[in-house]
Amino acid sequence: MKIIGFLFYLLFVLCFCAGAQTVIPLYEGAIPGEKQHENKEYDDNGIYSFVSKPDLTIYLPEVDSKVKTAVVICPGGGYHVVCASYEGHKIAKEMNKKGVAAFVLKYRLPNDNTCENKSIAPLQDAQRAIKVVRDNAEKWGIDPNQIGIMGFSAGGHLAATAGTHFSKSYIENKEGTSLRPDFMMLVYPVISMQPELTHGGSRDNLLGKNASSELLELFSNEKQVTEKTPRTFLTHAQDDDVVSVENSLRFYEALKAKNVSADMHLFSKGKHGYPLEPAASNWLGDVFKWMKEQELVD
């Protein structure tokens, strides 16, 4: 166990010194709630299927960067795949250009064959990612109070879940590290698990087709907002025919009802998947404008 811990630490040090992209396993030892299984993960040009061994790809900006902000990025994929290429790595590189440290999370996909409780496995991974970044903030030149989370589509649901369920630790956290993201940036997110709002595939993959009303309520993040929910940036296209814009609208309303700082940018056209749609090509500029207003970038 000591050897495993040392190797994990060594990976951190090498990553920090090199200032370059490095992939590390998300957990030092056992993965929480993991069932014994054959690893069937498949990579199709950055779109991952059957993910059961989560990892974190670390993108650090130039070491002389004055910006001390970090973002954990949760790609989308309907909790069926992880679209890490255009909703992860490409975004991380853009964050680096602004001096922001970025961490692309390849989280576990809910699967009864690999997880004891598949509904919490992605949340465990998101909490662990926040903990890893915060525990190593000094080493990586990050302000521990400027660690946010960003998510796309179902990854937006995961990010919003991390931002509304942080008071309960679903992972081992002996150090008592805060699992609360300091801000959220949600891009065409799935927010709700309620039948009239949700993306059916995301709901069924995460919670199952016969989820109880209590479970649907728990993972409907518009119903979990409190005064302590982090400040939030939302963006969505009104013609999104995959994830209804009502998800973002309801979350924005819930945030404002609790006096949480929130900014929402809507596009009349853009469909689902901004990184591939020229109609909504300014969305990332809106993100950085908001980050500047929040004093997260220069």
What are these regions (language model features)?
Residues D43, P189-Q224:
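Mobile cap/lid helix-loop segments that gate and shape the active-site cleft of serine hydrolases
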Residues L234-H236, D240:
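Short beta-strand/loop motif that positions the catalytic acidic residue
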Residues V245-D298:
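C-terminal catalytic histidine-bearing segment of alpha/beta-hydrolase fold enzymes
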Residues R128-T198, L216:
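Primarily recognizes the serine-hydrolase "nucleophile elbow" in alpha/beta-hydrolase
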Residues M1-V23:
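Bacterial Sec-dependent N-terminal signal peptides
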Residues V67-G76:
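Short beta-strand element of the alpha/beta-hydrolase
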Residues Q21-S65:
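N-terminal cap/lid segment of alpha/beta-hydrolase-fold proteins
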Residues C83-S85, H89-A92, L105-P144, E277-A280:
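Catalytic nucleophile-loop/oxyanion-hole region of alpha/beta-hydrolase
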